[in-house]
């Protein structure tokens, strides 16, 4: 009888501790990740020229160019910062994002795609319109699952 009680206590302890540990996990790594960079224009930038670049060059070339990533420049039309710009990078999952950009640096695989499709030149051209800070400051939002 005592042996059964000990086994029951051990199982109960494992259940409680396991449930507590699992309840602290807020994401599985499988939910989408939305990386947001709020783009701040450099001084004396022609906004219509920037928007033309965004539509005709950046967005059209980045459109599904990298598997698992949807990336584009957008403009706010409602809310607290109307007429502001942001770059959205929507990764299929946190796992995909971490594979592409481990430790805040592009992977060799991602660099190869960026070079083959000449996407780095577009990224560099984007930096002629927006401040360096707006390209390096971002938030990644992970879908809770």
Located regions from the model:
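Active-site-flanking beta-strand signature of metal-NTP-handling nucleotidyl enzymes
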Residues: 30-40, 86
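Short, glycine- and small/hydrophobic-rich beta-strand elements in well-ordered beta-sheets
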Residues: 23-25, 59-92
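Short, surface-exposed ligand-recognition loops at beta-strand->loop->(often short) alpha-helix junctions
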Residues: 41-53
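Bacterial Sec-dependent signal peptides at the C-terminal "C-region" and cleavage site
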Residues: 16-28
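Bacterial N-terminal signal peptides
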Residues: 8-18
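An amphipathic, aromatic/His-enriched active-site/gating alpha helix that lines ligand/cofactor pockets
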Residues: 61-70, 90-137, 144-145
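Short beta-strand-to-loop capping motifs
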Residues: 38-44, 89-93
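Bacterial N-terminal signal peptides that target proteins for export
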Residues: 1-8
